Amino acid sequence: MTLKIAIAGAGGRMGRQLIQAVHSAEGVELGAAFERKGSSLVGTDAGELAGIGHLGVAVSDDLESQKDKFDLLIDFTRPEGSLEHIAFCVANNKKMVIGTTGFDQNGKAAIKAASDKIAIVFASNFSVGVNLVFKLLEKAAKVMGDYCDIEVIEAHHRHKVDAPSGTALSMGEHIAKTLGRDLKTHGVFCREGITGERKRDEIGFSTIRASDVVGEHTVWFADIGERVEISHKASSRMTFANGAVRAGKWLENKANGLFDMTDVLDLNNL
């Protein structure tokens, strides 16, 4: 049975890549594509919007009218829109892949509550490489973390609206958890003026926003006389889109539950 996938935010940079990824993947098909209410893209063919030719799927701004056309919704939009989509998917028993970042604690709690009813993969980054980096960071933190200074440096395009990136925060969380620290109290997100000497147990974050950078993350484990750097650089959004489709296919036989890419890629067994 073919899994029918819908894309939220179909007209955005990520949405168009997701349409391409669904179209090129085996075992899935594009069932619906959505944009915000009143968008000028409503009625446009999703395939033509994504540059892959006519697909016969018109962009809609009404999930209710399209609910019989898809089994799973992939959502890389903004928190306020994603929360509306989550409520719809719970009410209509639709699975979700959520790549939206910038949720506050209430938003994350809503995702957790929804997963009692439907199956959700929620991740800050759907790149296979980034998720492998998460595991490498845990191993590096276990060996070096208590004896060095840890800094997370990230760069993205000028249009990104949240900082630090969700991926950078996830990196910090993986490190903090390994070291038994709370990122809320040990994370340092801004340094300016007379800050005093750096504390050993800090996890620092630096953010760059410039041009069309897709996404770059580097973590320093810096000790006196040596420094280990673990980096990931994305050159195309297709790596995230392909990962999201892979996650959707993995969810196909799941009734409910909250998962991330560690589950999809079985990284806990590394």
UniProtKB/Swiss-Prot annotation:
Source organism, top-level taxon: Bacteria
Record has Iron as a keyword: no
GO (cellular component) term, any one: cytosol
Main location: cytoplasm
Entries under InterPro entries matching the protein: DapB_C, DapB_N, DapB_N_CS, DHDPR_bac, NAD(P)-bd_dom_sf
HAMAP family named among the record's database cross-references: DapB
Biological role: Catalyzes the conversion of 4-hydroxy-tetrahydrodipicolinate (HTPA) to tetrahydrodipicolinate.
Protein name: 4-hydroxy-tetrahydrodipicolinate reductase
Organism placement in taxonomy: Bacteria, Pseudomonadati, Pseudomonadota, Gammaproteobacteria, Pasteurellales
Gene this protein is translated from: dapB
